[in-house]
Amino acid sequence: MSEINSQALREAAEQAMHDDWGFDADLFHELVTPSIVLELLDERERNQQYIKRRDQENEDIALTVGKLRVELETAKSKLNEQREYYEGVISDGSKRIAKLESNEVREDGNQFLVVRHPGKTPVIKHCTGDLEEFLRQLIEQDPLVTIDIITHRYYGVGGQWVQDAGEYLHMMSDAGIRIKGE
């Protein structure tokens, strides 16, 4: 309370209640003037308005927290859905990669050699054994020979993938296609 001596007012009120003769009640009545009562009522009203504002703020905060919780749960749900979706995509991709890796070209048996002897037409040869030994023999026969090694990918009848020359030749002959050999 601003201009009111609240302690003196309290003491006068307590003494006025306990005095049988009413002498101290006169002191209380002197201290409690209409302006004091109005000031006390104004202060009480300000306190009630303050409490009401705080209650409204608390209610607004509670509503905001509730909305944020709903948004958080929605975001968590979407995140879980996306995580599951991308885990599926990763799984499918991993399976696809594994399948593609299993279909990789094996170089053994898929290599052809373009052999060029000086002054002669280049010849294409297919190595069926150890490649290094085969190359060594070619170089021993003609040290000036140049050799290009070509790895070939075979596609058989109907565009099917085949792993090596032997499988390719077998598939072609099964389809009735004759291949002129060396």
Curated annotation (Swiss-Prot):
Which domain of life does this protein belong to?
A: Viruses
Q: Which InterPro entries does the UniProt record give?
A: Ead_Ea22
Q: What is this protein called?
A: Protein ea22
